[in-house]
């Protein structure tokens, strides 16, 4: 375990107890319970939960699977990402006075022993090194497809800070107009079939009865954007387009790839810009309702005269398929974890966009 020493505020018995555990030689389970006791002392809720290794790496599990899990980080304990910094290798709050007395010390020890210092820094560094080691031709394809730009993402000018910034991007959540960190809850792993975070009322919460690992759906995404954004493979049920350029009916079409939070329910945006047509984040496949992607795309095309919706959808679909095939060919024979993860991401993405079958006539008629 990691112990960080700094001048900490006196008078908070929960923080004093937790720091005593960190300084001592207590078992990790005892330190975890001290962490939660201090967290509850600040107004947080953490019941029936423990941290341990699972199939997705370190995660949170119920102590008693037959009982309800309760986790809540109130607004007062959410930490804006611009309120933290990396100081001598430790994640610290810049201005402790903006939070309850003792919270900055608790947060620093929490990050050192359960988040950034436990697995966060190491896993981010390993993933970024794996991507950096890919062949130049793969880097060029990833950049063209809007998935990864080495020069912007990991230029190597300040390695520690670059890893830290990637860490923040994988941990923050948009809440009431701010990008914030949610201590303890951020340790919950992602699963597409799980419920999302409860952001109603005061703070952010996760709860319910969990037979095994506590999981939550981070957001709407697809396999490749999840992999390049978060650093792990996931068989997401939806597939969005990658960046593409093509010709349709004698006109240049620019497709902006990526997922949208409302991408499973609302048509994408299609508009004319100067001499080209811009299609923004079209959904190409959806496992639970394979007739929806083409239906939503047809509704988007209906507001732009002169488009042949089915033909353009097929062109975008084919362009994505060819791009994935190209990446897989470039990765053939390439070793390393980064190449292996990217290969799996391409295959998962190919499956995801393949969930396209027919249209929803009821939705087309009601448009």
Label the model's feature ranges.
Residues 1, 67, 211:
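Short, conserved catalytic/metal-binding motifs centered on acidic residues
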Residues 7-65, 74-83, 224-225, 230-367:
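Charged low-complexity "KEKE/polyampholyte" interaction tracts
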Residues 13-53, 111-221, 265:
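Catalytic core of the SET domain in histone-lysine N-methyltransferases
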Residues 58, 68, 201-203:
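A generic structural signal for beta-strand entry/edge sites
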Residues 72-76, 218-219:
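Short, surface-exposed secondary-structure boundary micro-motifs
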Residues 79-104, 111, 121:
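Phosphate/adenylate-binding glycine loop and adjacent helical scaffold
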Residues 105, 109, 163-171, 325-329, ...:
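Short, hydrophobic/amphipathic alpha-helical patches that form generic packing surfaces
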């Amino acid at each position: 375990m990691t112990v960080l020493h700094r001048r900490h505020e006196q008078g908070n018995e929960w923080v004093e107890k937790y720091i005593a555990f960190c300084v001592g030689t207590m078992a990790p389970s005892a330190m975890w319970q001290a962490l939660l006791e201090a967290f509850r002392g600040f107004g947080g809720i953490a019941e029936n939960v423990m941290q341990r290794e699972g199939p997705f790496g370190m995660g949170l599990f119920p102590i008693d699977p037959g009982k309800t899990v309760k986790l809540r980080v109130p607004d007062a304990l959410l930490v804006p990402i611009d309120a933290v910094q990396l100081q001598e290798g430790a994640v610290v709050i810049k201005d402790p006075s903006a939070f309850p007395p003792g919270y900055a010390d608790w947060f620093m020890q929490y990050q050192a022993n359960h988040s950034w210092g436990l697995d966060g820094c190491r896993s981010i560094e390993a993933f970024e090194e794996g991507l950096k080691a890919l062949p130049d031709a793969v880097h060029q394809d990833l950049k063209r497809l809007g998935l990864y730009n080495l020069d912007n993402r990991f230029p190597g000018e300040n390695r520690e800070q670059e890893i830290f910034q990637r860490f923040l991007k994988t941990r923050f959540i948009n809440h009431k107009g701010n990008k914030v960190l949610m201590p303890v809850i951020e340790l919950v792993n992602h699963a597409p079939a799980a419920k999302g975070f409860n952001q109603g009322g005061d703070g952010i919460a996760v709860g319910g009865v969990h037979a095994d690992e506590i999981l939550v759906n981070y957001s709407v995404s697809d396999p490749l954007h999840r992999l390049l954004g978060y650093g792990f493979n996931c068989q997401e049920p939806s597939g969005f387009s990658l960046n593409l350029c093509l010709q349709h009916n004698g006109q240049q079409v620019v497709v902006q790839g990526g997922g949208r939070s409302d991408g499973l329910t609302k048509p994408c945006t299609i508009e004319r810009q100067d001499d080209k047509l811009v299609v923004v984040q079209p959904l190409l496949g959806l496992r639970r309702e394979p007739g929806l992607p083409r239906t939503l795309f047809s509704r988007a095309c209906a507001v732009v005269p002169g488009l042949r919706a089915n033909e353009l959808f097929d062109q975008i679909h084919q362009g994505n398929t060819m791009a994935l095939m190209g990446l897989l060919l470039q990765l053939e024979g390439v070793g390393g974890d980064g190449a292996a993860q990217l290969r799996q991401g391409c295959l998962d993405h190919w499956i995801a966009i393949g969930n396209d079958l027919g249209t929803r006539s009821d939705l087309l008629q009601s448009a």
